[in-house]
Each structure stands twice: as C-alpha cells, then as structure tokens.
Amino acid sequence: MSLTGWFIGMQNSTYPLAVSMAVNAVNIVCSLCFVFAMRLGFIGIPLGTLAAQWCGFILSAFFAARMMRKETLGYAPRIDEMLRGLGRFFSVNRDIFLRSLCVMAVMLFFTATGARSGNMTLAVNALFMQLYLLYSHFMDGFAYAGEALVGKYAGAADKHSLRRCVSHLFAWGWSLAAIFAFAYGVFNHEVMSLFSDKPEVVAFAAAYRWWIALAPIAGMAAFIWDGVFVGLTATRQMLLSLAGATAVYFAIYFLSPFPDANSSLWTAFLTYLAVRGVILWLCFARKNEY
C-alpha cells in the first residue's frame, strides 16, 4: 500500500494497475491450486492470498527500484531536516487516522440503524451502499489524479495551474455524478435487478430510489476536495471537515422530522456528504496561497 501511494504521488498509475492485476491473478490461481489440486481445503485460501501479497510486494519493489534508478537525488538531507520531515509525516498520519475513525463511526451507525428498521430495509440499504461504492470507485480515480497533480503544482508554487486543475476535476466530477444520478434514479429497477434476484427487494428499493440517486450529487465535491487536500497535505482541514460533517450527521438524524427512520438516516447521510464538500470548499477559498 505504501508503494502504491508513492507510485500515484509520482504520477505513475500504470505500475499500481499492473501490481493489482498480478495480485488478483496470482490469488485466483494459487487458491485454486491449493484448494483443489493439493486438496488443502479452506486452508488453501489464505495461503493463496499470502502468496499473492508476497508477489505484489516483490513486483512493487521491482517497479520502485526501476523508477528510482531514473530519478536524480539533488542532495542528501541533513538530520534536522529528516526529523522535521518525520514529524510532519506522523502529523499527517494522525489526522488521516482520526478522520478515518469519523468515517467508520458514520458507516457503522448507518448499518446498525438500518438493521433495526427490519430485514428489508437492511437489504435495500446494503444494496444502495454497493451502488454508492461503485460510484466512489470511479470518483477515486479523479481524487488520485488530484492528489498527484495538485501536489505537483503546489510544490512548484504554480497557483494558476493548480486552480485550473481543480476546475477541470470538478467539471469531470459533475459530469460523472450526473450520469450516475440519472442511472440510479431513472433506471433504478434495472440497476437493482443486477444486484438482487429478489423481486420484493427490488420493489421495496423503488420507494427510496431518489435517496441513492442524490448520493452522487451530494458526495461529488467531497471526493474531489479530498484528493485536492491530500495533494496539498492539508490533512488538518480534512479532519476538521469530517468531524464537523459527522456532528451534523448525528444531529440531522436525531432531529429529523421524518416519521420514517430510514428516510431520516438517508437525509443525515446525504447532508453529511454535502457538508464535507462545503467545508473543504470554504477552507480552499480562504487560503490565499492556493
């Protein structure tokens, strides 16, 4: 994972893709061999995963060495510079760790609350979350691009290119969000049928289809800004935005006027996504150096 982040930071997405494909291929082949050919049973599955992870590590190390041979080191950093850099490194990791805790709290509460509303609601919410995750995988591509490009322009103090990059990211983000929102809202029955063969679940999902249709619109800015702020290493603002959005999430849920608990839950979740984007936009707008 560390080398994957480094590759993306160096604006090389080809190597992470190759490593990911190799890991999955080795995992499938080794698991089949261990389980069926060698008759190890379920023990063969983790062994296949272990072999795949080692393959991924070796391949990543090879790619990293290959890239580093092409890089020219300008100078050897002094001890005090290394210590300052290490302190900054741990500070960034602390902020991201605390931010992740907030995300986990929101998602755990969402799942637990949906479960208390009945099996049908739990099933529909689980499927809707799969749709949201599908959308998030597409948006992560723009976020990763933002991390690398914004980091490059921020390091070069090129404000014009940085702002132009952010504008382009949002243009692509809005376009993708509109496509997913249209598909989830208008073709909800067809989309849900791809994820469930239970007619009653698909029919029940129709009553809440506009919640999942609004999710791409509400969450788009949060994805883009996350990539931008990672590129700026402005993790403190990311933490504060997530903490503020989490507080709003719980407040909206418990104060919501909806008699339907699931509608209150989705109102809180969509507001949480939107607030994240708004807070980060305000942080970006206030920083003159950006």
How would you name each of these model-derived features?
Residues 1-16, 124-186, 220-233, 237-241:
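Small-residue-rich hydrophobic transmembrane alpha-helices
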Residues 4, 31, 110, 188, ...:
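Generic structural marker for isolated residues within well-ordered, non-membrane alpha-helices
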Residues 12-13, 41, 119, 198, ...:
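Short loop-to-helix capping motifs
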Residues 26-29, 35-97, 150-215, 255-290:
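Short alpha-helical transmembrane segments in multi-pass integral membrane proteins
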